[in-house]
Regions:
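Chalcogenol-based redox active-site neighborhoods
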Residues: 1-161
């Protein structure tokens, strides 16, 4: 089943990097009582994700937060160390929370996983943006093609706030 507007996020664990090292955070800990702009990419450091999607998020981060968003988060099916390196490279001001979905548990649980085995990536997340309020999906913008950022960028979600 694919998640849709009005659905509650499932209970899944992410890995996040903190000052004390890698930590486990549940969807409840991340989303409960908060307004969260969640962006998902197929892979850290991949061309579209790195050169198009992340810049659309970081460029619009201040404006998104000014619209009442508590947290801007980015998730990908990568391990926490890759996500930390990607954050260091794309978001040195730490405007976003990077959520490692290493085994695609979240992507699969919400039905937004994609099999990219043919190009050598394996199971990944579809590219999307989502506005979540207190764990409930309020906006959802899923790309039809994982190689483009036409409706999942920071500018699109900003316009929906």
């Amino acid at each position: 089943m694919t998640i849709k507007i009005g659905d509650r996020l499932p209970d899944v664990k992410f890995r996040v990097m903190t000052g004390e090292g890698p930590q486990v955070k549940t969807t409840d800990e991340i989303f409960k009582g908060k307004k969260v702009a969640l962006f998902a990419v197929p892979g850290a450091f991949t061309n579209t994700c790195h050169k198009m999607h992340m810049p659309s998020i970081t460029t619009n981060a201040s404006a998104i937060k000014a619209k009442g968003v508590d947290t801007i988060a980015v998730t990908s099916v990568n391990d926490i160390f890759v996500m930390k390196a990607w954050q260091r490279d794309t978001d040195p001001e730490l405007q976003t929370l990077f959520l490692a979905d290493g085994m695609a548990d979240f992507a699969k649980a919400i039905g937004l996983d994609i099999d990219l085995a043919a190009p050598g990536f394996g199971v990944r997340s579809k590219r999307y943006s989502m506005l979540v309020e207190d764990g409930v999906v309020k906006q959802l913008n899923v790309e039809d093609n994982p190689g483009v950022v036409e409706k999942s960028g920071g500018d699109t979600l900003l316009a929906q706030l």
